[in-house]
């Protein structure tokens, strides 16, 4: 009897030691694979499949996954007599047209440091335009203090911005915000904003140009 109890206790102890530790993850809960059981550890294949599911989930939640200028934005640009900036200017021309910071943010998808941008705490009434093509993007009336150190808005102007899936950070799908006319990278949008939209358009100051209202 004592030997059987000892054998059972030893087996239980070995099973407990064989269980893998839980690994932290920044994937959405719906995209995670089922928790491992029976001593089966996480595998690279499991994480790869989870990443694919996460990409699919993020793609379905984005308003658009296309990186080309939207038809609405191009139509508006043509109506205003503006050229198709996304195809008419070369990378070298953009370098000459923009400052170093503006080029890094808008054409190379960079991110400025929090609390350093020109407009992160600006409360001046006006319209925020794209620094590359002058398209009006956000009204100051939709700007709010998000506490993040970047200019934040709960709503863009019409169809002047577009969104696409951003998987530049592994296991953390995000929604990139771009100018619909010239494809300039503006920032990212999140679902933790105020009413009435519940959105937070987190935008780089270097991608904007504020035109004050009289």
Swiss-Prot record:
Q: Where is the transit peptide?
A: 1-53
According to the entry, every stretch annotated as the MsrB domain falls at: 91-213
Induction trigger: By salt, mannitol, cold, methyl viologen and abscisic acid (ABA).
Question: What catalytic activity does the UniProt entry give for this protein?
Answer: L-methionyl-[protein] + [thioredoxin]-disulfide + H2O = L-methionyl-(R)-S-oxide-[protein] + [thioredoxin]-dithiol
Q: Which UniProt keywords apply?
A: Chloroplast, Electron transport, Metal-binding, Oxidoreductase, Plastid, Redox-active center, Transit peptide, Transport, Zinc
Q: What is its EC number?
A: 1.8.4.12
The record makes one more remark, namely: Lacks the conserved cysteine (here Thr-148) required for the reduction by thioredoxins (TRX) through a dithiol-disulfide exchange involving both redox-active Cys of TRX and MSRB. The reduction mechanism may occur through sulfenic acid formation on the catalytic cysteine (Cys-202).
UniProt lists the family membership as follows: Belongs to the MsrB Met sulfoxide reductase family.
Q: Which PANTHER family match?
A: METHIONINE SULFOXIDE REDUCTASE, METHIONINE-R-SULFOXIDE REDUCTASE B1
What is the designated name of this protein?
Peptide methionine sulfoxide reductase B1, chloroplastic
- This chain is encoded by the gene named MSRB1
């Amino acid at each position: 009897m004592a030997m059987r109890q000892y054998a059972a206790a030893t087996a239980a102890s070995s099973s407990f030691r064989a269980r893998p530790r839980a690994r932290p993850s920044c994937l959405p809960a719906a995209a995670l694979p089922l928790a491992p059981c029976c001593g089966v550890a996480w595998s690279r294949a499991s994480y790869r499949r989870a990443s694919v599911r996460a990409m699919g989930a993020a793609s379905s939640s984005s308003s658009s996954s296309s990186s080309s200028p939207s038809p609405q934005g191009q139509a508006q640009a043509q109506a205003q007599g503006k050229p198709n900036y996304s195809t008419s200017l070369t990378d070298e021309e953009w370098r000459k047209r923009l400052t170093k910071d503006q080029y890094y943010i808008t054409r190379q998808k960079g991110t400025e440091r929090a609390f350093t941008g020109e407009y992160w705490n600006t409360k001046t009434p006006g319209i925020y335009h794209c620094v590359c093509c002058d398209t009006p993007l956000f009204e100051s009336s939709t700007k709010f203090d998000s506490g993040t150190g970047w200019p934040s808005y709960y709503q863009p102007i019409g169809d002047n911005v577009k969104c696409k899936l951003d998987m530049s950070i592994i296991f953390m799908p995000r929604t990139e915000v771009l100018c619909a006319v010239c494809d300039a990278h503006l920032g990212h949008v999140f679902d933790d904003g105020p009413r009435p939209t519940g959105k937070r358009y987190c935008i780089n100051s270097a991608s904007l140009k504020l035109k004050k209202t009289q």
